[in-house]
A protein has these predicted regions:
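Short, well-ordered alpha-helical
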Residues: 1-67, 72, 91-96, 214
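An N-terminal boundary/leader segment
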Residues: 1-31, 53, 252-262, 310, ...
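Acyltransferase
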Residues: 11, 243-269, 290-312, 345-362
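Residue-level signal for inorganic ion chemistry
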Residues: 15, 195, 234, 258, ...
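A short helix-breaking turn/cap at a secondary-structure junction
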Residues: 28-31, 164-252, 425-426
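Short helix-loop capping/hinge segments that flank enzyme active sites or metal/cofactor-binding pockets
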Residues: 40-61, 231-233, 283-350, 388, ...
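Glycine-rich, small-residue loops and helix-cap segments
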Residues: 46, 80, 84, 139, ...
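Short glycine/serine-rich loop segments
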Residues: 72, 79-202, 382-390, 396-399
């Protein structure tokens, strides 16, 4: 068997066989139970999301003993609709908030995640284990999370689909936090339709997460997905230095195929935008982590963000890439009424939303395509989805993201499904 899975629908027996045979070298599944042979869909959950009876470590020794007898709200939603997760996926330690030099997909607990396409390629991060698991046939889909590219980057690296929804579509209650303004669970899957199905299972209002107040109680993002033949325009963001030859070839194929199904792709400039991501996340993680640990900690973990930093300082010999990102957060005032923080939050989110709005308006477009990661949707709290469009000679995948405005999740999925369908034609 190949580590990269391209076969038919997975059975419990087959995925269990694949996990046992390949997980030791891919380091994608952190914990798992025997999957239910009667289940029609098999889902894993990123290891920063609380699941009853399983640890929620975020890849960190500090949280090795963090085990709850309750589910995160989004997991409760999924269970209420008959889907029960059977395990946890590995991830970049603390969702990448440990060090700026740490490789994507690495954690002390989970080791280095390996891309099933080629071990020399990055798996991306921080939802590395989710994308590796989907690509390797360890599950049908995986619940992942994103603050700043953590769903779409590994999805593009591993050649799968990954959607980060509008912040507020899915509750963050019971998820190890970085930023309440930007964090969200999302979906990693083999197809756009599977991603839409998982998002529909996870979505819904939660009284403990005010960002979800505008989310419908019973959201269905799958009905008639990708079946529309209505002509649409999509803006392609072009960097100042353009695209390399292999990207150009993949894009030319994409543009030509899209023309056959009434999707016109027009070029638009990729603008440089000040997001203030570092200040926003460094400020918010301090109070957000304090709150999470007070509600979900169990006495065997640090009880505050400062204690978490101290835990790492006392074990610096175990962290070959340092802890500069984690320590650096302490340089920022955690007070959410601080004017510098408020100005950065307002300016950063508005800059990104305006970049999306202006691009759509100027190009008279319905959505926007970017090659690789562009932070507009992460900091603008808006939806975008990653899918593969080609592959380089060195086997590295060429991926795009498709994004739109806040709460246009259905539109993003529909356009992605139409594009996916034409790319899959012979």
């Amino acid at each position: 068997m190949d580590t990269l899975y391209k076969g038919p629908a997975l059975t419990a027996e087959l995925l269990e066989k694949r996990i046992r045979e390949f997980n030791w070298e891919l380091h994608a599944v952190a914990q798992w139970r025997e999957p239910d042979p009667k289940a029609r869909w098999h889902v894993l959950v990123k290891d920063n999301i609380c699941v009853d009876g399983l640890r929620a470590t975020a890849g960190s020794k500090a949280f090795k003993a963090l085990k709850n007898d309750k589910d995160a709200f989004c997991v409760q939603k999924m269970r209420s609709k008959g889907i029960h997760p059977f395990g946890k996926t590995t991830m970049s330690e603390l969702a990448g908030f440990l060090s700026t030099t740490m490789p994507m997909g690495y954690s002390e607990l989970g080791a280095q995640g390996i891309n099933p396409i080629d071990p020399d390629l990055t798996p991306g991060g921080s939802s590395s284990g989710s994308s590796i698991s989907v690509a390797a046939g360890f599950c049908d889909a995986a619940v992942s999370t994103e603050t700043h590219g953590s769903i779409v980057i590994p999805a593009m690296a591993c050649g799968v689909v990954g959607m980060k929804p509008t912040v507020g579509l899915i509750s963050r209650t019971g998820v190890v936090p970085i930023s309440h303004s930007l964090d969200t669970p999302g979906a990693t899957a083999r197809t756009v339709n599977d991603a839409a199905r998982l998002l529909s299972l996870l979505a819904g209002p939660d009284v403990d997460d005010p960002y979800t107040d505008h989310c419908p109680a019973d959201l269905d993002l799958t009905t008639d997905l990708g079946l529309s033949k209505t002509p649409i325009r999509v803006a392609l963001l072009v960097p100042q230095d353009g695209f390399d030859p292999e990207q150009k070839t993949a894009l030319e194929n994409l543009i030509a195929r899209c023309k056959t199904v009434n999707i016109k792709i027009v070029e638009a400039p990729l603008k440089t935008v000040e997001t203030h991501y570092k200040r926003i996340s460094s400020t918010e993680i301090q109070g957000d982590m304090d709150k999470f640990l007070s509600q979900w900690g169990n006495g065997q973990t640090p009880s505050s963000f400062k204690e978490l930093v101290q835990f790492y300082r006392m074990r610096d010999q175990h962290h070959p890439y340092g802890i500069n990102r984690l320590e650096g957060a302490l340089e920022y005032d955690p007070d959410l009424t601080n004017n510098d923080y408020l100005s950065a939050l307002i300016e950063g989110t508005e800059n990104c939303r305006l970049a999306i709005k202006d691009t759509l308006y100027t190009a008279t477009a319905d959505a926007i395509i970017a090659v690789g990661f562009v932070p507009w949707w992460a900091v603008g709290q808006a939806p975008y989805i990653a899918l593969p469009i080609g592959q380089r000679q060195n086997k590295e995948m060429i991926g795009i993201t498709i994004g739109a405005r806040q709460w246009e999740d259905r539109k993003v999925l529909d356009i992605a499904a139409r594009i996916e369908a034409i790319l899959n034609r012979d």
